């Protein structure tokens, strides 16, 4: 048996889950279980410990496949057999005709996070694997993401008082499949995972060829880990720089920056300072500007104008930027006139 297909034993489950289910856990948890092998192994592993905090298993029925309801009921039966409570969460209402997978993902997390907060849970655990991480990195590379996006899925992400946790993110999917087989935990295979109509399904067909050239899932995941470390350092530098560059005199709801100070920053830091300043004045509801657009404005227009001592007025990411007299003011973009 290869290491990549070795089942997890109780000790490894404990090492990965004790922080969230053991004596030092901050509170209860919700386990997101679709019925596939990854999340089934998560549920089975949690049941084996046993948990010292309240555990709720949740399955989202997206209503996209005729068999989805029966699969959710199968998860409920296995959860009952393992001694864990279970809830089925239904995504109801009209479904979009385009970007269906994105909409389904957003609905899934909304339902799961709502349940976690309703339960007073401290954490929501999902069973994303090394394979998922590699696919995510490739998808974001295809979409033109920068270093932050190529950092992939975070092992732990804090959402207010709730932690979104992926305890299996460094494990190959094959180990979780082997675990279910060894333990006799039944699971289903979603045909949508290999559906060539969707980008992720198409990339799954390509990945064996990339691995043959050396671009394995493990190397893609390691790249994501390195980029997350680098991004954390750049983010800290950008936060400090934004504080240092802030100047008085901004309009209410706006921000004023020392433009010359912005121009002497390393380009990667300056880019993040501009993005943070825009996010601050626009607020959390606006869609952030795409990285390519940020780069075009900063490197193609703003920095050259600062160097020339010139003026500039443009919009970016929902903000109005005005460069004049060595200062850069940012304010929310005024609403467009109807007609």
UniProtKB/Swiss-Prot annotation:
ATP binds at residues 34-39. The keyword Cell inner membrane does not apply. GO terms for biological process: tRNA modification. It comes from the Bacteria. Disulfide bonds: none annotated. The keyword tRNA processing applies. Keywords: ATP-binding, Cytoplasm, Ligase, Nucleotide-binding, tRNA processing. It holds the Pfam family ATP_bind_3. Coiled coil: none annotated. GO terms for cellular component: cytoplasm. Its EC number is 6.3.4.19. InterPro entries: Rossmann-like_a/b/a_fold (IPR014729), TilS/TtcA_N (IPR011063), tRNA_Ile_lys_synt (IPR012094), tRNA_Ile_lys_synt_N (IPR012795). It is found in: Cytoplasm. One of its GO terms (molecular function) is tRNA(Ile)-lysidine synthase activity. Gene3D superfamilies: HUPs. It catalyses: cytidine(34) in tRNA(Ile2) + L-lysine + ATP = lysidine(34) in tRNA(Ile2) + AMP + diphosphate + H(+). The N-terminal region contains the highly conserved SGGXDS motif, predicted to be a P-loop motif involved in ATP binding. Belongs to the tRNA(Ile)-lysidine synthase family. Ligates lysine onto the cytidine present at position 34 of the AUA codon-specific tRNA(Ile) that contains the anticodon CAU, in an ATP-dependent manner. Cytidine is converted to lysidine, thus changing the amino acid specificity of the tRNA from methionine to isoleucine. This is tRNA(Ile)-lysidine synthase. It comes from Methylobacterium nodulans (strain LMG 21967 / CNCM I-2342 / ORS 2060). The lineage of its organism: Bacteria, Pseudomonadati, Pseudomonadota, Alphaproteobacteria, Hyphomicrobiales. The gene is tilS.
């Amino acid at each position: 048996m290869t290491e990549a297909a070795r089942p997890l034993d109780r000790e490894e489950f404990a090492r990965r889950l004790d922080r969230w289910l053991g004596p030092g856990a901050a509170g209860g948890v919700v386990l997101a279980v679709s019925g596939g092998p990854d999340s089934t192994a998560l549920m089975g592993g949690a049941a084996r410990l046993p948990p010292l905090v309240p555990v709720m298993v949740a399955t989202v029925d997206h209503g996209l496949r005729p068999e989805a309801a029966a699969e959710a009921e199968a998860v409920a039966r296995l959860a009952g057999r393992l001694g864990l409570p279970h809830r089925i969460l239904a995504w109801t209402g009209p479904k979009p005709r385009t970007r269906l997978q994105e909409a389904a993902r957003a609905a899934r997390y909304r339902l799961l996070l709502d349940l976690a907060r309703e339960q007073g849970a401290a954490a929501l655990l999902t069973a994303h694997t090394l394979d998922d991480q590699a696919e995510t990195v490739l998808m974001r590379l295809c979409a033109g993401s920068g270093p932050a996006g190529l950092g992939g899925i975070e092992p732990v992400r804090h959402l207010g008082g709730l932690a979104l946790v992926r305890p299996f993110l460094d494990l190959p999917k094959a180990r979780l499949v082997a675990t279910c087989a060894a333990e006799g935990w039944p699971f289903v295979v979603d045909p949508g995972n290999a559906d060539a109509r969707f980008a992720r399904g198409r990339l799954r067909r390509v990945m064996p060829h990339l691995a043959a050239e050396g671009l394995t899932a493990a190397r893609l995941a390691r790249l994501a880990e390195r980029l997350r470390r680098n991004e954390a350092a750049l983010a800290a530098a950008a936060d400090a720089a934004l504080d240092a560059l802030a100047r008085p005199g901004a309009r209410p709801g706006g921000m004023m920056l020392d433009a010359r100070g912005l121009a002497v920053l390393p380009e990667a830091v300056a880019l993040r300072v501009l993005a943070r300043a825009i996010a601050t004045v626009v607020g959390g509801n606006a869609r952030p500007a795409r990285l390519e657009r940020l780069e075009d404005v900063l490197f193609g227009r703003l920095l050259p104008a600062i160097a020339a001592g010139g003026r500039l007025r443009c919009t970016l990411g929902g903000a109005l930027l005005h460069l004049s007299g060595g200062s850069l003011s940012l304010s929310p973009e005024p609403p467009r006139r109807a007609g």
